[in-house]
Swiss-Prot record:
It comes from the Bacteria. This is Flap endonuclease Xni. The keyword ATP-binding does not apply. GO terms for molecular function: 5'-3' exonuclease activity; 5'-flap endonuclease activity; DNA binding; magnesium ion binding; potassium ion binding. Residues 163-256 form the 5'-3' exonuclease domain. Mg(2+) binds at residue 105. Its EC number is 3.1.-.-. Keywords: DNA-binding, Endonuclease, Hydrolase, Magnesium, Metal-binding, Nuclease, Potassium. K(+) binds at residues 172-173, 181, 183, 186. Has flap endonuclease activity. During DNA replication, flap endonucleases cleave the 5'-overhanging flap structure that is generated by displacement synthesis when DNA polymerase encounters the 5'-end of a downstream Okazaki fragment. Gene3D superfamilies: 5' to 3' exonuclease, C-terminal subdomain, 5'-nuclease. The lineage of its organism: Bacteria, Pseudomonadati, Pseudomonadota, Gammaproteobacteria, Alteromonadales.
Length: 256
């Protein structure tokens, strides 16, 4: 069975770089990133591997909602200037890079979905909880920094919802890290309680007359924001890709 290791490039690199006291110093960074990739390959033993990078184009999410990710700390200039060197170094060691036009998330989701649809297995290396919405038994999420899988049970316990409700939850409660608004006045606790009773965002709005007056007023006022937030958090799994699985095959063990 084909097993594809998909690494969220910027998620990995920025966290490795964050351990550096001086953000302008990228000395040894490419070697540390390569070391992390070697460790991932050794542990998971995939048949194929790719590291996916964000691109510079404005994402469809930013076009839809200009405040998306607004205020997020920009990438340090030294790191931005060193990315091509990191990619080249990884390529020398047989780790294939995929450059997304804008956000890597949708490309990662598409790669994973395409593979499991042909009976393969995908392991996504990222700390981004948004990938939890890819509800398939052969798609696994690996947190490299905590050296653990993000399990369904752990996510459900942490958020108080079922995995299938993640998009509905974020549409209601929002996601401050990505500046996704959610419904004003409906926080995490209210979102969990509403989903416990009504199960989904659509059912909540279809049952608005049964919701308490105070919450119903907030939900009605924030209906458009809920719809917008739902779109923003939902991963696309049908992105056009100009790559094929053969490109990602691991040609030989990386034993350097």
């Amino acid at each position: 069975m084909n097993k594809l290791l998909i690494i969220d490039g910027m998620n990995l690199v920025r966290r490795i770089h964050a351990a550096q006291p001086n953000e302008s110093d990228i000395t040894g960074l490419k070697e540390r990133v390569h070391g992390a990739c070697r460790k991932l390959l050794k542990y998971h033993i995939p048949t194929h591997a790719a590291i996916v990078w964000d691109g510079d184009a404005i994402s469809w999410r930013k076009t839809l909602f200009p405040d998306y990710k607004k205020g997020r700390k920009p990438m340090p200039e030294a790191l931005a200037n060193g990315l091509n060197d990191i990619k080249a170094y990884l390529a020398e060691h047989h780790i294939h890079s995929v450059d997304a036009d804008s956000e890597a998330d949708d490309v990662i989701a598409t790669l994973a979905t395409k593979l499991v649809n042909i009976d393969g297995e995908a392991i996504i290396v990222s700390t981004d909880k948004g990938f939890s919405q890819l509800n398939h038994p052969k798609i696994k999420l690996w947190d490299h920094f905590n050296q653990t899988y993000l399990t369904i049970e752990e996510m459900e316990k942490k958020l108080g919802i079922e995995r299938s409700q993640l998009i509905d939850y974020l549409a209601l409660a929002g996601d401050s890290g990505n500046k996704i608004p959610g419904v004003p006045g409906i926080g995490p606790k209210s979102a969990v309680e509403l989903l416990r009773i009504y199960r989904s965002l659509a059912s909540i709005y279809n049952s608005i007359d049964k919701v308490g007056a105070k919450q119903a007023k907030k939900l009605e006022a924030g209906k458009q924001m809920a719809r917008l937030s739902y779109k923003l958090v939902q991963l696309k799994t049908d992105m056009p890709l100009s790559v094929n699985l053969k490109q990602f095959r691991i040609k030989k063990p990386d034993s350097e």
